[in-house]
Swiss-Prot record:
Name of this protein: Small ribosomal subunit protein uS8
GO biological process, one term: translation
Family: Belongs to the universal ribosomal protein uS8 family.
Subunit structure as annotated in this protein's UniProt entry: Part of the 30S ribosomal subunit. Contacts proteins S5 and S12.
Top-level division of the source organism's lineage: Bacteria
Entry keywords, A to Z: Ribonucleoprotein, Ribosomal protein, RNA-binding, rRNA-binding
Residue ranges that the Swiss-Prot or TrEMBL entry lists as coiled coil: none
A GO-annotated cellular component: ribonucleoprotein complex
Pfam families (alphabetical): Ribosomal_S8
Single annotated GO MF: structural constituent of ribosome
Summary of the function given for this chain in its UniProt record: One of the primary rRNA binding proteins, it binds directly to 16S rRNA central domain where it helps coordinate assembly of the platform of the 30S subunit.
């Protein structure tokens, strides 16, 4: 059976794993999921990520990060969904928690944070908010 929204599945797996204090979470891999994991690592929300080949199917393993026993990611939510895509121009890119959080945006130059998209002067599809 095919999954209708693999990005929402990825975010839900991360949210659920952090809710039960797991050290890492494993999921099916894709180029977009790896790019999201790279942005999360660059912003300091996860420890590390790795792609492992498991019998012909690539698996993405994400090492979760905690501070003082609490998850570093307090909120992670999908914005643009398959049924309702959300696109923002360069002047309409939202701030998450007045700049304390991050919006991950898919642009023609690849995936990037809201701050980098504003600095670059590009808009795109708002995939998710992380705080």
């Amino acid at each position: 059976m095919s999954m209708s929204d693999p990005i929402a599945d990825m975010l839900t797996r991360i949210r659920n794993a952090q809710g039960v204090q797991k050290a890492s979470v494993v999921m099916p891999s894709s180029k977009l999921k790896v790019a999201i994991a790279k942005v999360l690592k660059d912003e300091g929300y996860i420890d590390d990520y790795a792609v492992q080949e498991d019998g012909g199917k690539a698996q993405l393993s994400i090492g979760l990060k905690y501070y003082a026993g609490r998850p570093v990611i307090e909120r992670i939510e999908r914005v643009s969904k398959p049924g309702l895509r959300v696109y923002k121009g360069r002047s309409d890119i939202p701030q998450v928690m007045n700049g304390l959080g991050v919006a991950i945006i898919s642009t023609p130059q690849g995936l990037m944070t809201d701050r980098k998209a504003r600095a670059t002067g590009v808009g795109g599809e708002v995939l998710c908010y992380v705080a």
